[in-house]
């Protein structure tokens, strides 16, 4: 031990005290320490901290059209007129000064300025201090472009860049306008033969004396290009032979990025890729027209080819109907799908298998072959049917809704059906062999496949058929349908439908009941049961006819994802080969719609207006898609 001051010579030092036991004790292990931080004054917060109120005033931005934009971004306004204290109000006001200046510069007021002022209203008994925050903006002069210069090499046509650049001398130096003009060049260039066009950094030289700005933009156009070949990489789903079915361009055609996007969309629509990219690649090959051939690199990655699907519906007279499907979209590559379908309903049961080749040698052309067994039991007839069919079709798709579509094919059907024999006065069962060549042509001038809002559609079905039941009887089934859609407003669509059908060359009683025409149901005249319209037997059951006419009008009102649809339908089926137009049956009702990405879900309730004996007072229909 030592002392602070030395002891005088000859003095005796005091003995050293015994050690304090606390100092010699072992240290507490680190794990035993309490690590909770000590509370400080700054940490103690009042559950009800004092608040001040303030009002916000903006001045000077209305005349340049920026007041609304400033208000939507203002820190003062976003604070809701409340702050912890006056210092916070002042800090928000400073933020809003800078905001006003940024907005002014964005539309060409580069000398713009803004100041803020905070005024306090003296408190009165029972009334706390209230502040008034005022931000005053001074726009200053508007800067305009004195010149516009695009620096690039030669292009074809020579005005390709200038004609598609929406800036000219005298325009205000407005950020959004400049960015939009530059973006347009990046769109137009690849659409017109320049897939590698790049925009450099713009330069705007301001002159505060004028006040103007000289605008310069470097543009690297790259080579003018034409389409070359398709090449592929990755885990291939399709080989080059099938890939070359999809392009809507030919080798040597001037490059257009829209056609590249279309190719990518068409490949994605097959549903067979987990990822896919289509990118132009320089080749250095020069074509006869001086353009460089650009190959398209298709990088593929396989996706899951199998899927399960299902639909459900209900309608008066048809009951519940459930359908489930299993699909392997690429079992027989390329795009050879196997589809197994099972129908389970209160009045219909069936099983079918379909082979479908999509994009069969031509884009959007489909070949399908189906084998199906079905049992159905309705008031009109019951039938046990086996069908073999094949069909070629040219279809619309979500990425290309075609004006003209069609299908044609062949069908062989064996069916055992019950029918009412008027000569015997009772129901009997007969077996029919039917061969048919069904065809359909549709002209579509509507704006949407699933939920049209304007335009019209015309559809013609013709099916030459032969029926063998004792002897062979040839005949022709025809159907003509037209629909029209008119947009009254953004939320109201008027829709109408007319349909007429005729069967020529055979007597009704020689025709299999399943091939006759019937009226009534969700896709026909709502308010009446499925197949209930037309001639009846003595028991009041429908027997069908050789002709049909129908009409419908709907008002489709939509609000958000929901809709209400009042409607009126009319129609009937007749024993004669041509519809008479007499004895029309009318139904009216109202429906609800829930709109989804794959079409509207429909619930319709209808009542017959001139009901017959045995007709229900109310009919209900549930399904996907509009009625027409």
Question: What residue spans do the PLM features occupy?
Answer:
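Residues that define the transmembrane beta-barrel architecture of outer-membrane proteins
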Residues: 181, 292, 318-320, 347-349, ...
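C-terminal outer-membrane beta-barrel translocator/porin domains of Gram-negative envelope proteins
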Residues: 269, 307, 407-561, 566-570, ...
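Transmembrane beta-strand segments that form the barrel wall of outer-membrane beta-barrel proteins
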Residues: 247, 280, 306-316, 322-324, ...
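Residue-level signature of outer-membrane beta-barrel architecture
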Residues: 328-330, 357-359, 394-396, 443-445, ...
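Transmembrane beta-barrel wall of Gram-negative outer-membrane proteins
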Residues: 351-352, 357-431, 437-439
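Outer-membrane beta-barrel "beta-signal"
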Residues: 438, 592-596, 600-601, 617-628
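Periplasmic polypeptide-binding modules associated with outer-membrane biogenesis and secretion
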Residues: 2-71, 75-316, 325, 339-357, ...
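Repeated loop/turn-to-beta-strand initiation elements of outer-membrane beta-barrel proteins
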Residues: 274, 306-308, 319, 331-338, ...
């Amino acid at each position: 031990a030592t002392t602070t001051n030395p002891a005088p010579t000859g003095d005796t030092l005091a003995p050293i005290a015994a050690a304090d036991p606390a100092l010699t004790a072992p240290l507490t292990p680190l794990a035993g320490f309490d690590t909770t931080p000590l509370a400080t004054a700054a940490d103690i917060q009042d559950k009800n901290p004092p608040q001040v109120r303030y009002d916000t005033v903006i001045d000077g931005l209305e005349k340049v059209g920026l007041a609304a934009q400033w208000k939507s971004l203002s820190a003062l306004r976003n604070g809701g007129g409340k702050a912890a204290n006056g210092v916070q109000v002042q800090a928000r006001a400073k933020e809003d000064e800078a905001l006003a200046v940024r907005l002014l510069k964005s539309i060409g007021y580069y000398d713009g300025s803004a100041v803020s002022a905070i005024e306090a209203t003296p408190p009165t008994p029972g009334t706390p201090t209230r502040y008034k925050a005022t931000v005053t903006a001074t726009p200053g002069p508007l800067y305009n472009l004195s010149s516009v210069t695009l620096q690039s090499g030669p292009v074809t046509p020579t005005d390709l860049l200038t004609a598609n650049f929406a800036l000219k001398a005298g325009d205000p130096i407005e950020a959004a306008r400049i960015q939009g003009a530059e973006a347009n060049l990046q769109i137009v260039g690849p659409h017109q033969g320049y897939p590698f066009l790049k925009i450099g950094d713009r330069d705007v030289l301001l002159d505060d004396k004028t006040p103007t700005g000289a605008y310069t933009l470097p543009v690297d156009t790259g080579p003018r290009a034409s389409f070359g070949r398709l090449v592929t990489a990755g885990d291939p789903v399709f080989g080059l032979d099938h890939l070359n079915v999809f392009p809507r361009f030919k080798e040597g055609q001037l490059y257009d990025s829209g056609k590249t996007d279309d190719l990518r969309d068409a490949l994605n629509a097959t549903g067979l890729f987990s990822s896919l990219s289509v990118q132009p690649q320089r080749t250095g090959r020069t074509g006869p027209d001086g353009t460089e051939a650009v190959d398209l690199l298709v990088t593929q990655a396989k996706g899951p080819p199998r899927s399960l699907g299902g639909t459900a519906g209900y309608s008066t007279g048809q009951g519940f109907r459930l359908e489930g499907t299993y699909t392997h979209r690429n079992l027989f590559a390329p795009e050879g799908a196997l589809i197994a379908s099972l129908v389970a309903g209160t009045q219909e049961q069936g099983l079918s298998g379909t082979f479908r080749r999509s994009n069969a040698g031509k884009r959007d052309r489909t070949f399908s072959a189906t084998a199906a067994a079905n049992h159905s039991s309705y008031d009109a007839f019951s039938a046990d049917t086996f069908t073999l069919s094949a069909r070629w079709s040219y279809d619309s798709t979500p990425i290309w809704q075609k004006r003209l579509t069609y299908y044609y094919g062949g069908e062989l059907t064996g069916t055992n059906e019950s029918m009412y024999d008027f000569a015997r006065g009772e129901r009997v069962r007969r077996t029919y062999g039917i061969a048919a060549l069904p065809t359909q042509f549709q002209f579509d001038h509507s704006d949407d496949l699933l939920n049209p809002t304007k335009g019209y559609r015309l559809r013609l079905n013709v099916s030459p058929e032969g029926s063998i039941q004792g002897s062979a009887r040839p005949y022709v089934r025809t159907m003509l349908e037209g629909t029209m859609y008119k947009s009254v407003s953004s939320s109201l669509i008027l829709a109408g439908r007319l349909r007429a059908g005729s069967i020529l060359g055979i007597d009704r009683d020689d025709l299999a009941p399943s091939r006759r025409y019937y009226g009534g149901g969700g896709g026909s005249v709502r308010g009446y049961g499925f197949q209930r319209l037309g001639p009846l037997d003595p028991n009041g059951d429908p027997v069908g006819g050789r002709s049909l006419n129908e009409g419908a009008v709907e008002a489709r009102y939509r609000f958000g994802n929901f809709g209400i649809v009042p409607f009126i339908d009319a129609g009937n089926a007749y024993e004669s080969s041509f519809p008479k137009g007499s004895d029309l049956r009318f139904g009216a009702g109202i429906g609800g719609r829930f709109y989804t990405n794959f079409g509207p879900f429909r619930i319709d309730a209808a009542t017959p207006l001139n009901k017959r004996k045995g007709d229900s007072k109310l009919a209900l229909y549930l399904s996907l898609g509009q009625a027409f």
